[in-house]
Amino acid sequence: MIVVVDTNIIFSSLLSHKSNMAEILLGKIHQFVAPHFLFTEIFKHKEKILKFTRLTEDELLELLSLLLGNIQFISTSGISSSSLQKAFDLCRHIDLKDLPFVALSIEYDAMLWTGDNKLKTSLTQHNFTKFFNP
């Protein structure tokens, strides 16, 4: 099964790296994918992550390397305009930063793994129900 990993799943795994989420990410059971945009989001919030995790920068980079090692990163340029448009229609009232994740899920007919309940609720109201709930 292909699973699109949202940024907040990575954040949660970093904040509690012994969590069930981190274990699932480190496992080889599912094929995880994410847009390159995930990197931007992580490094945009790097200082906040360091503060909350109390990790050193080297420890954070090592943990990120482990967590991201099982994720295949995909450029949004490889997503069809049809999938991007559907994702835009679904995300425009929530947060356009979610668009690349939703578009990947549509493009690959994949499950979306997110902890963003506002996003889940809105997508469900628009008949998107392909959520990964481990």
Write out the residue ranges for each language-model feature.
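PIN-domain endoribonuclease scaffold, especially VapC-family toxins
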Residues: 26-29, 33-88
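A generic structural signal for short hydrophobic patches within well-formed alpha-helices
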Residues: 10, 39, 119-120
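Active-site neighborhoods of divalent-metal-dependent phosphate/nucleic-acid chemistry enzymes
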Residues: 73-115
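Residue-level signal for well-ordered alpha-helical positions
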Residues: 17, 45, 125-126
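Hydrophobic side chains within alpha-helical segments
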Residues: 9-11, 44, 101
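Short, well-structured N-terminal submotif of metal-dependent ribonuclease cores
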Residues: 1-34
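Short amphipathic alpha-helical segments and helix-helix/interface helices
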Residues: 21-23, 61-64, 101-102, 120
